[in-house]
Design a protein with these regions (language model features):
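Glycine/charge-rich catalytic "coupling/switch" loops of P-loop NTPases
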Residues: 2-23, 28, 46, 53-108, ...
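Short aromatic-glycine-enriched beta-strand elements
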Residues: 33-39, 105-112
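Glycine-centered tight beta-turn/hairpin loop motif at sheet-sheet or coil-to-beta transitions
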Residues: 42-44, 115-117
């Protein structure tokens, strides 16, 4: 699923503008006082999301249930490389191959295809596209902070 995605919920069908909507399975829910950590497996990729306990309860999130990792393109950062970085606090590091580069007037869109076939797209300033070597065919890492990854359910 990509961009303007139709989703069904108790509130009815809605469409969202988030560029990245990845279907997976919840592998763990860590309960906290105010926030919790939800782990979701999307293809071969393990992702984590820090969301409020209220959201965990409202969505009735449980281990083993299907869910969506929702990431706005503006929340995706990029780095050069073919291995996750070990000196970075962001938990979600998705290694892939650059498959699309679309420069705009000041910033552009870059898409990576992951080993499992999932695609993640992010926004990046044009000068950084060149500086990071984000060219079709090159390896890169899409980085998303756990606080920037939303969870959705049907």
């Amino acid at each position: 699923m990509r961009g303007m995605t139709d989703t069904n919920s108790e509130r009815g069908t809605m469409r969202i503008s988030a560029r990245n909507v990845l279907k997976g399975t919840i592998t763990d829910v860590e309960i906290g006082a105010v926030s919790g950590v939800v782990s979701i497996k999307v293809g071969e990729t393990a992702l984590t999301s820090v969301i409020t306990m209220e959201a965990i309860h409202d969505l009735d999130l449980k281990k083993g249930m299907p869910a969506y990792a929702v990431i706005k393109a503006s929340h995706v950062m990029f780095a050069r490389g073919d291995e996750p970085l070990d000196n970075l606090s962001a938990r979600n590091q998705l290694v892939g191959t650059v498959t699309t580069v679309r420069p705009g007037k000041t910033d552009g869109r870059v898409s990576l295809t992951l080993a499992d076939g999932n695609i993640i797209t992010g926004s990046v300033f044009n000068d950084m596209i060149g500086e990071l070597g984000l060219e079709v065919g090159n390896k890169a890492i899409a980085i998303v902070k756990s606080t920037d990854l939303m969870i959705g359910v049907d």
